[in-house]
């Protein structure tokens, strides 16, 4: 696969993005850290508040990163922006408006995976700083890849499991993961792992729900 821009152009773009918007990126990172700590503790954040944070992550990446910056070197970024806006709208509609999402520390086999992904997304700026020997010309926070990894972790702690909310994040794990090796962003090698984990988690939930439904339908009915 050949990208429509060079590695140098990509890292120059990241430098411009970080320089222009770093205060907002720090705020977004701090909000994500606080939400994660509260979710891990008994004082978990409001479900609507956490849904709103996920919506903010995706809408920010859509407008501030894809539309405002990435379109300068890649025309496909307009399509990416539309996908990210749609994902943000889905989180806002299902989680904030309708209150259909609930988040809590889970006690199952997926919980360790969820927390590793959340922790990795928060450490993502530091990992890139070490790997690239820079604090400016790197993907830091408020960009698509850590957004996807953070989202995957949080969704694994959500009820009910929603495969609809997982489609676009899993798609991005393929898109971003395929570009990671070409651009030399080794921190993004975690994207395919996060995508596979989220896909399996969501499909398992769909299978479990189907099994329950079939059990209810097949249960004998007795008339009084």
Describe each PLM feature range.
Residues 63-71, 123-133, 177-183:
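Juxtamembrane "helix-exit" motif on the non-cytosolic side of transmembrane helices
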Residues 50-59, 164-176:
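Central hydrophobic cores of alpha-helical transmembrane segments
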Residues 76-151:
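Membrane-proximal helix-loop-helix units in multi-pass membrane proteins
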Residues 38-49, 71-74, 97-109, 157-162:
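Membrane-interface helix-boundary motifs at transmembrane edges
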Residues 25-36, 82-97, 144-158, 191-207:
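Hydrophobic cores of alpha-helical transmembrane segments in multi-pass inner/ER membrane proteins
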Residues 75-80, 182-196:
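Loop-to-transmembrane alpha-helix initiation sites
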Residues 1-71:
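N-terminal topogenic module of multi-pass integral membrane proteins
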Residues 68-72, 156-167, 174-189:
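Membrane-helix boundary connector in multi-pass membrane proteins
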């Amino acid at each position: 696969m050949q990208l429509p821009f060079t590695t140098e152009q990509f890292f120059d773009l990241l430098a411009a993005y970080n320089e222009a918007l770093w205060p907002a990126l720090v705020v977004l990172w701090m909000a994500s850290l606080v939400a994660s700590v509260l979710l891990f503790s008994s004082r978990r954040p409001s479900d609507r508040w956490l849904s709103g944070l996920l919506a903010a992550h995706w809408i920010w990446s859509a407008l501030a990163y894809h539309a405002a910056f990435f379109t300068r070197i890649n025309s496909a970024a307009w399509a990416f922006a539309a996908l990210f806006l749609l994902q943000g709208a889905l989180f806002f509609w299902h989680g904030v408006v309708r209150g259909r999402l609930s988040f809590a520390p889970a006690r199952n086999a997926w919980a360790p995976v969820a927390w590793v992904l959340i922790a990795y997304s928060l450490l993502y700026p530091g990992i890139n700083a070490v790997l690239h020997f820079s604090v400016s010309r790197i993907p830091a926070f408020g960009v698509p890849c850590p957004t996807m990894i953070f989202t995957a972790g949080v969704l694994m702690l959500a009820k009910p499991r929603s495969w609809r909310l997982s489609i676009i994040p899993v798609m991005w794990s393929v898109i971003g993961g395929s570009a990671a090796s070409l651009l030399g962003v080794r921190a993004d090698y975690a994207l395919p792992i996060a995508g596979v984990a989220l896909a399996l988690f969501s499909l398992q939930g769909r299978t479990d729900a189907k099994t329950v439904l079939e059990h209810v339908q097949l249960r004998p009915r007795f008339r009084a």
